[in-house]
C-alpha cells in the first residue's frame, strides 16, 4: 500500500482549519510530520511533531496525539501555530497578501527525524496554500488627502460594514488582517500612520484628526454602509483606536487588542485638546533569557501617578468597545489597562464595554493558526522584544477571539436586514 500524506483543503484561507492524515504505514510505527514555510525574505520557519500510527497504519491529526516535538497531545492545527523561525527573532508576517499565498510544505518521515545534520528522505509530501485574501476581494491603494493605506472590498455591490485596521509601533502598512476580514464580508481600510510613503518616518505625536480624516473617507465611499464604522486595533494602535472611540462620532464599534487605555510615549492632539503622555520607566525593563526585552513592568507602577490629562475618557464613547487581552502579555499589563477602563465605564453608569481576558495568551493575538510569536525583532527599538504567550493558551486565544471579533462587528455594525 502506498504511503500518503493527505491535507484538506490544500488551498484555503489562513483562518480555515486543515485536516491532515498519513496512511499506508506499518501499524505502531513512529513517524515525524514536519511543516516548513519561507517568508517573502526567504526566512525559514519550521515545526515538527512525532506520532505513532494506529493498527491500520494511519495517523489522523484530529484524533492522534503527538508524543513529542513542538507540541504534545491532540492538536489538529499544531504544525501551523507552532511554526518557529530557524533564525532567532523573525516574525512570520505576510506582506503581499493579494498575489501569493503562504506555501507550507508538509513532509512525512517513517522515524523520529529531529537531527538537522542527518538528511532522511521523506516518505510523502504535501503542499498547502494558505491565503490571506478570498476570491473576489479587491484592493484599492489609498492616497486621499493625508490618508495613506489600502482598502479591501469584498465581492458584490455592497454596501458593506466599514472597519479601520490599526497596528502598533511596527510602522508601515500591515494588510494581512484587513484582507482576511474583507474575505468575511467587511470593507476594511488598513491604515498606515508612520514610516510609509510620505508619512512621518517616526511618530512625534498622535494627531487624531488624521484618523478622523480616514474615518470620513471611509464613510464617504459608495460601498461603505452608514452611519458609522468599526475599528480593529492592536498595541499602540489600540490606544489610538480607543481614542477614536472616545472622540469620533463616526466610530461605533471598537476592538482594542492588548493596548494601553492611557496616552503613552507621544502626546495626543485633537482640535484644541492636547493629552500628555506617560513615559515608561525604562529602568524597569527586564531582559528575557532569549535576549529580548520585557516592557511589561515599565508602566505598571504609573497607574498611581495618572491624572485626567493621561487617561482616555472611555465614558465619552458613543459606541461599543471590546477589549481583548492576553494575561501573559510581556509588553504591557494589558489586562490592568482594560480593567481600569471597564471600572471607569461602570463608575459612569455605562455598559458599553466588554473584556475578553485570555490566561496564558501574549501580546500578538493574531488570526487563528498564526504562528505564536513569543519574541521578535522590533525595528523602532533596534532590539528584540518579548511579546509573551504560552503556545497552547495563545493558540486557543487566537482561535476564540477571531470568532468573537467577527460576531462583535456583525452585531454592532450591521443594519437590520443585512445578510452577512
UniProtKB/Swiss-Prot annotation:
Active-site residues from the entry: 235 (charge relay system), 329 (charge relay system), 363 (charge relay system)
Superkingdom of origin organism: Eukaryota
Motif mapping: Microbody targeting signal: 418-420
GO MF terms, alphabetically ordered: N-acyltransferase activity; thiolester hydrolase activity
Keyword ATP-binding: no
Major subcellular location class: other
Gene Ontology CC annotations of this record: peroxisome
GO biological process, one term: fatty acid metabolic process
Job description of the protein: Acyltransferase which efficiently conjugates very long-chain and long-chain fatty acids to taurine. Shows no conjugation activity in the presence of glycine.
Name assigned to this protein: Acyl-coenzyme A amino acid N-acyltransferase 2
Protein source organism: Mus musculus
